[in-house]
Amino acid sequence: MEVPPRLSHVPPPLFPSAPATLASRSLSHWRPRPPRQLAPLLPSLAPSSARQGARRAQRHVTAQQPSRLAGGAAIKGGRRRRPDLFRRHFKSSSIQRSAAAAAATRTARQHPPADSSVTMEDMNEYSNIEEFAEGSKINASKNQQDDGKMFIGGLSWDTSKKDLTEYLSRFGEVVDCTIKTDPVTGRSRGFGFVLFKDAASVDKVLELKEHKLDGKLIDPKRAKALKGKEPPKKVFVGGLSPDTSEEQIKEYFGAFGEIENIELPMDTKTNERRGFCFITYTDEEPVKKLLESRYHQIGSGKCEIKVAQPKEVYRQQQQQQKGGRGAAAGGRGGTRGRGRGQGQNWNQGFNNYYDQGYGNYNSAYGGDQNYSGYGGYDYTGYNYGNYGYGQGYADYSGQQSTYGKASRGGGNHQNNYQPY
């Protein structure tokens, strides 16, 4: 068998730069030489790849084992988290010292030392602030006559407790001082109370005819306690429709507590029920519940609930109200409006009542809820706690009621109920 002769013709190289020694080799073994311009860039690729690999490895390790940062925070999955061990209380040094001293005081009280040289005054060093808060000493003697206690009216809205204390300290040592503020807005209500250590200091204050503080004349008066005053158990219900039956009244007011007596006043001229009544409970708790809401829907009308006042309080206030303020007449004999309505001043004698609080400030205090100055109230009988405080309530008797018969032809007469 004949062997074909070897090819003498070799194809030309594909690239001119290919070496001649490779021309006779198979093309599958040949690789072109990389361009010269890429050669300087190749060394920098290796470090970059190494850095990327290191980052990937670090992220993998971090995900498996979270590392702690400064302050105790940890990183897991690329997010910061706050472990339970990081809950620390950062307090200033002064707060820490006060807390440590208070703890030491409590320990000393529970386990008093055998050494008698440690006095109770030392133990009370940090507890005096809580035990003798503002007004605490004044409230402590509210049921007793204290000759060193004074009522200060006509204060400026800008007068602070410090200003009042500094002014009155020139007359004697001030043991306690408080300025009453609105519980909602925190603004001063223009009056306060002061307790002197010595009763003679009160006489010194009263000897001076005129007192001026913060550019305004103030009016200090001696506090007089109303001894033996019982908590209110009797309420006045105004605006009651005469059509409301006694059974309806018992059913509604009996839900608040046990009723002792119900008074339904009658008009002696017309022999008809008047537009108000009185409810007496066996204790004061139902009265507190009733006064939580001023108006109550009873029967077909809305009624207003107030605390009834004794006769002597009413007479005293009527003497003060002569001259215009708190007058019961509502314009030309009672009713305006073409003379068809009958003006019933059914709260005559109950213009001022013992409210749930000194302006709803505290359930133990009675007084003027709408106090806007010091004019027009009884300095000898204002009420702070069990201290009587005179007029200043909104005049309830001036309101008109259309309940009852309407007088014809402009006959406007008033049903003036006298106090019990």
UniProtKB/Swiss-Prot annotation:
Domain RRM span(s) in chain numbering: 148-230, 233-312
Alphabetized GO MF terms: DNA binding; double-stranded DNA binding; poly(A) binding; poly(G) binding; RNA binding; single-stranded DNA binding
Annotated GO biological process: regulation of gene expression; RNA processing
Region (Necessary for its nuclear import and export): 396-420
Cellular compartment(s): Nucleus; Cytoplasm
Post-translational modification: Dimethylation of Arg-408 is probably of the asymmetric type.
Chain positions with N6-methyllysine modification: 161
Modified residues (N6-acetyllysine): 216
Low complexity composition-biased segments: 36-52
Modified-residue entries (Omega-N-methylarginine), positions: 25, 408
Residues annotated with Phosphoserine modification: 241
Residues found modified as Dimethylated arginine: 408
Cross-link (Glycyl lysine isopeptide (Lys-Gly) (interchain with G-Cter in SUMO2)): 209
Residue ranges of coiled coil: none
Gene3D superfamilies, per database record: 3.30.70.330
PROSITE patterns registered for this protein in UniProt: RRM
Keywords for the protein's UniProt record, in alphabetical order: Acetylation, Activator, Cytoplasm, Disease variant, DNA-binding, Isopeptide bond, Limb-girdle muscular dystrophy, Methylation, Nucleus, Phosphoprotein, Repeat, Repressor, RNA-binding, Transcription, Transcription regulation, Ubl conjugation
Biased composition (Gly residues): 323-342
Residue pairs linked by disulfide bridges in the UniProt entry: none
GO cellular component, one term: nucleoplasm
Main location: nucleus
Involvement in disease: Muscular dystrophy, limb-girdle, autosomal dominant 3: An autosomal dominant degenerative myopathy characterized by slowly progressive wasting and weakness of the proximal muscles of arms and legs around the pelvic or shoulder girdles, elevated creatine kinase levels and dystrophic features on muscle biopsy. LGMDD3 is characterized by a mild late-onset and is associated with progressive fingers and toes flexion limitation. Affected individuals may also develop cataracts before age 50.
Role this protein plays: Acts as a transcriptional regulator. Promotes transcription repression. Promotes transcription activation in differentiated myotubes. Binds to double- and single-stranded DNA sequences. Binds to the transcription suppressor CATR sequence of the COX5B promoter. Binds with high affinity to RNA molecules that contain AU-rich elements (AREs) found within the 3'-UTR of many proto-oncogenes and cytokine mRNAs. Binds both to nuclear and cytoplasmic poly(A) mRNAs. Binds to poly(G) and poly(A), but not to poly(U) or poly(C) RNA homopolymers. Binds to the 5'-ACUAGC-3' RNA consensus sequence.
Protein name, as recorded: Heterogeneous nuclear ribonucleoprotein D-like
Lineage, uppermost ranks: Eukaryota, Metazoa, Chordata, Craniata, Vertebrata
